[in-house]
């Protein structure tokens, strides 16, 4: 009997996302329930955005939740390497095989030509897709151009008509027309694979039997299915999980909800409660109980109990469930958990240099730096009264800074300062006009340690959470203002 093998394959391009943990949990439960294995693979072919720091954060966040893997970059295994950036020669071998079989072709089209083709197709109300310009190039001519060092990608061929039947474990057979599919790039000009080729090759070579992934990948499933067909490989069973949603039913995003696992760790949620809550996202225990452990979920796990309705990720419900877990802890365990959270040595070492020179006794630390150990703050609207700016201008300035910070990929003091500076200069203001508002939103005080240092230490999700909290206190942003201010944001360098 074939051993069930599932996997999670996150990209190390930012803070570890709750959506990653959600999909990892269901892959883990499915594998364990069937006596199988769960693999962690790192999809780091985006060399510009991928970092080892983000990779380590993924490891740490999943382990904090209690999610462990049988094979992966840090634990090894018989199917390594488990980082896609270390498997380049493997992908090239299989890309060359597809070209040799006539299932793929080198494409030399420039970005300018592709833009022109797509613009013309859109003007004609056609689906934008590659027009096959290089598909019928003479193979000898293509090889001559490659040998001469001409920049190119490798594209897969796809049918131009008919439908692809996608067998989904949750939805049954899903029919997707082939004319919606583009001739997908498989190998980029830099010699690295795209998601589609790497995904299929790795899943096959690593013996993955079941793929549980987010439903946002369902529309592109025909490309993956066609690649399995081209290689002559058995396709793993496919299961497209419902996406996590905000309370307003929109896709979970950092604009409306903190999405980083590290945010919830820093806020003082128990990992057991967080995992329990993620387990209730679109799934329920047979007896409908709300509180259950990972082992209990594995014992009773049945993929057919997954509901296709978009599960709502609601902070209030998560907090309620966390409270249930906290209240059932023995007092000694509760005290130990508080100590582990509040007196985290690594976190304290980040804070200590900014506090040590400003206090004369330890008792002065809490009033000065207590905000480092809080989640939501009790804000006073009077702190946002500005000598120079009207209330509307205050909201606009803070909203633009929040949006600008949302686009920041590397959370460092200099880059945070640069974001704020860019906004204030565009509004013809000074940095000193914004800093009192930042102090108020981030620390809940008129003054404290350097607010820029505080923002770096608190991290992106908690910083943005507090800015959103302050904006809500000041009345929020109307739909009309959002439209107008987003246009303004686009013009800020």
Curated annotation (Swiss-Prot):
Cellular component GO terms, alphabetical: cytosol
Entry note: cofactor: Binds 1 zinc ion per subunit.
Residues annotated as binding ATP: 254
Annotated localization: Cytoplasm
EC code(s) of this entry: 6.1.1.17
GO molecular function, one term: tRNA binding
Motif stretch ('HIGH' region): 10-20
Family of the protein in this entry: Belongs to the class-I aminoacyl-tRNA synthetase family. Glutamate--tRNA ligase type 1 subfamily.
Protein name according to UniProt: Glutamate--tRNA ligase
Protein species of origin: Ectopseudomonas mendocina (strain ymp) (Pseudomonas mendocina)
Gene expressing this chain: gltX
């Amino acid at each position: 009997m074939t051993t069930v093998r599932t996997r999670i394959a996150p990209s190390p391009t930012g803070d570890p996302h709750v959506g990653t943990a959600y999909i990892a949990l269901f892959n883990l439960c499915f594998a364990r329930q069937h006596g199988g294995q769960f693999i962690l693979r790192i999809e780091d072919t985006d060399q510009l955005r991928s970092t080892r720091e983000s990779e380590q954060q993924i490891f740490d966040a999943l382990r904090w939740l209690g999610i462990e893997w049988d094979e992966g970059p840090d634990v090894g295994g018989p199917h390594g390497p488990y980082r896609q950036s270390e498997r380049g020669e493997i992908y090239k071998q299989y890309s060359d095989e597809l070209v040799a079989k006539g299932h793929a072709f080198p494409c030399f089209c420039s970005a300018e030509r592709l833009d022109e083709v797509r613009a013309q197709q859109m003007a004609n109300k056609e689906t934008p897709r590659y027009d096959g310009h290089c598909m019928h190039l003479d193979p000898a001519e293509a090889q001559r151009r490659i040998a001469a060092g001409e920049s190119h990608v490798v594209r897969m061929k796809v049918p131009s008509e008919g439908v692809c039947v996608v067998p989904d474990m949750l939805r049954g057979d899903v029919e997707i027309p082939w004319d919606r599919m583009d001739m997908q790039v498989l190998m980029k000009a830099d010699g690295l694979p795209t998601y589609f080729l790497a995904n299929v090759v790795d899943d096959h070579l690593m013996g993955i039997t079941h793929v549980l992934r987010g439903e946002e990948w369902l529309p592109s499933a025909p490309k993956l299915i066609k690649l399995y067909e081209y290689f002559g490989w058995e396709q793993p069973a496919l299961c497209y999980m419902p996406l996590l949603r905000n309370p307003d039913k929109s896709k979970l995003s950092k604009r409306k909800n903190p999405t980083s696992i590290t945010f919830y760790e820093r806020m003082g949620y128990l990992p057991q409660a967080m995992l329990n809550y993620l387990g209730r996202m679109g799934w329920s225990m047979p007896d409908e109980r709300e509180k259950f452990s990972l082992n209990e979920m594995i014992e009773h796990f049945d993929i057919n109990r997954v509901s296709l309705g978009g599960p709502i990720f609601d902070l209030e419900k998560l907090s309620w469930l966390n409270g249930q877990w906290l209240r059932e802890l023995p007092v000694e365990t509760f005290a130990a958990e508080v100590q582990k959270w509040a007196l985290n040595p690594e976190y304290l070492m980040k804070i200590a240099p900014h506090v040590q020179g400003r206090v004369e006794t330890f008792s002065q630390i809490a009033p000065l730096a207590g905000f480092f150990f809080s989640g939501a703050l009790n804000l006073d609207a009077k702190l946002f009264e500005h000598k120079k700016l009207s209330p509307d201008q205050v909201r606009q300035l803070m909203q633009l800074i929040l949006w600008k910070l949302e686009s920041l990929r590397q959370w460092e003091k200099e880059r945070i300062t640069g974001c704020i500076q860019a906004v204030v200069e565009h509004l013809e203001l000074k940095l000193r006009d914004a800093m009192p508002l930042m102090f108020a939103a981030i620390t809940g005080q008129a003054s404290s340690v350097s607010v820029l240092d505080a923002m770096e230490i608190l991290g992106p999700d908690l910083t943005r959470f507090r800015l959103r909290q302050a904006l809500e206190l000041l009345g929020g942003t109307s739909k009309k203002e959002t439209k107008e201010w987003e246009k303004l944001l686009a013009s800020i360098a």
